[in-house]
């Protein structure tokens, strides 16, 4: 089977779990003798293996933004489009968060969801023509429901099944103004009827999106994210220094402020003087001021030497990060549909301390490799850390259980086999 996986790129300026999810699935599907084509949208992809084989970036972020905002750009010569879609321009755009956050992009989100009725209809036709004439897939897999505007024309032109993953669309949509938020959910529900199946990354998020988009149960599948534990090395957690790790985009929404405040509370107790904090995951320009505030708080507490900020987050630096932390916490303010960093940590033998939000309890519960706390406050997080971070026996127990839990419930090869079965089911129905 030949699968075209359409994936929005983040540009590589921060740890993008959704991008890594798609990249890992592509490799696992190829191991199952499936032919997979990764088709990037908006920005270049963040992944460990840069193997796009010169597939062009469709819907270049700079190009479509200018055409959306300034009508004059809709009539520019082709060489201008090529320049705006060059890798150097797109990588520069990725450093500026306007392309990776919803505020200010509401109208473009609506236009993208409208597909052939939106302002990006030219880009849509270019993508469809390339899929039809060059890629020639048997099935198209959309990375998230914000891409549902592509489905109608793909099916009209190619008469093949289209499936759509569900992960964190609410994070993008719910920060919009009331008017745009309601409009986007309505269009997503309507356009969602045009795909053959939805695939949620967690039970939690399946229930959430079933309610929001009124998805029929027979069209909704659950396929947890997976990792290959062979890709990670396990350093015995009992031999590590007591270092708490954070790996995600370093921003307010991902709980960086909660993390720092909890660490300051923890360090008020002299019993935890050996504990350090290690932070990585990248950022965009939008995050700079907030990060500066956190560093100022740390400096005011005299803890600059206890907190290590690591700029590089792609492999091998990411593995080095996992080699040196004994515990992982990413206290996302409103939770997440999944959170791939949890599996990367567990596969490296690192226990989790996560808030009881989103799918975090689902991952912790199935893996048995961590603890959760509630509410998501600095005080509760510091208390949860205290119950584990200096307890070598407890850390070791959670480390062993977590690694086994990943192998049992979140193995990328098993999950990929399930994904192929979903493709086969929709292909028969289509």
Tell me what each language-model feature is.
Residues 38-126:
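A conserved catalytic-core segment of Leloir-type glycosyltransferases
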Residues 323-337, 350:
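Acidic donor-binding loop of glycosyltransferase active sites
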Residues 276-295:
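Glycosyltransferase donor-sugar binding loop
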Residues 366-378, 387-392:
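Conserved acidic donor-binding segment of nucleotide-sugar-dependent glycosyltransferases
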Residues 204, 226:
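Carbohydrate-associated surface elements
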Residues 237-254, 260-264, 278:
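Conserved donor-binding/catalytic core segment of Leloir-type glycosyltransferases
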Residues 291-313:
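Nucleotide-activated donor-binding/catalytic signature segment of Leloir-type glycosyltransferases, i.e.
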Residues 380, 387, 394-409, 415-421, ...:
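A short, well-ordered alpha-helix in the C-terminal region of glycosyltransferases
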């Amino acid at each position: 089977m030949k699968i075209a996986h359409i994936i929005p790129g983040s540009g590589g300026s921060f740890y993008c779990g959704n991008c890594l999810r798609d990249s890992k699935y592509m490799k696992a599907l190829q191991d199952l003798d499936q032919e997979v084509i990764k088709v990037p949208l908006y920005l270049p992809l963040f992944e460990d293996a840069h193997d796009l084989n010169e597939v062009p970036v469709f819907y270049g972020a700079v190009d479509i933004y200018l055409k959306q905002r300034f009508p004059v750009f809709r009539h520019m010569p082709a060489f201008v489009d090529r320049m705006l879609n060059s890798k150097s321009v797109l990588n520069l755009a990725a450093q500026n968060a306007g392309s990776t956050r919803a505020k200010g992009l509401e109208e473009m989100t609506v236009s993208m969801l409208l597909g052939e009725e939106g302002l990006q209809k030219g880009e849509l036709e270019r993508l469809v023509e390339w899929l039809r004439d060059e890629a020639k897939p048997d099935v198209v897999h959309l990375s998230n429901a914000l891409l549902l505007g592509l489905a109608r024309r793909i099916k009209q032109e190619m008469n093949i099944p289209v499936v759509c993953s569900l992960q964190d669309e609410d994070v993008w949509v719910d920060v919009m103004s009331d008017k745009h938020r309601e409009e986007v959910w309505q269009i997503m529900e309507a356009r969602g009827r045009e795909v053959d199946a939805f695939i949620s990354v967690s039970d939690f998020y399946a229930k959430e999106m079933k309610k929001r988009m009124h998805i029929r149960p027979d069209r909704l599948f659950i396929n947890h994210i997976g990792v290959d534990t062979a890709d990670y090395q396990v350093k015995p957690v009992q031999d590590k220094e007591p270092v708490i790790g954070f790996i995600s985009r370093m921003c307010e929404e991902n709980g960086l402020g909660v993390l720092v405040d909890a660490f300051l509370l923890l360090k008020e107790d002299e019993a935890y003087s050996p504990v350090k904090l290690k932070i990585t995951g990248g950022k965009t320009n939008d995050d700079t001021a907030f990060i500066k505030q956190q560093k100022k708080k740390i400096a005011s507490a005299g803890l600059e030497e206890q907190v290590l900020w690591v700029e590089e987050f792609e492999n091998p630096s990411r593995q080095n990060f996992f080699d040196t932390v004994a515990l992982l916490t990413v206290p996302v303010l409103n939770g997440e549909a999944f959170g791939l960093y949890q599996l990367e940590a567990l596969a490296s033998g690192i226990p989790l301390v996560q808030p009881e939000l989103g799918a975090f309890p689902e991952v912790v519960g199935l893996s048995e490799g961590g603890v959760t706390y509630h509410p998501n406050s600095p005080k509760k997080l510091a208390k949860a850390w205290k119950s584990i971070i200096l307890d070598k026996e407890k850390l070791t127990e959670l480390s062993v259980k977590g690694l086994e839990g990943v192998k049992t419930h979140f193995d990328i090869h098993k999950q990929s086999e399930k994904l192929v079965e979903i493709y086969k089911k929709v292909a028969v129905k289509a």
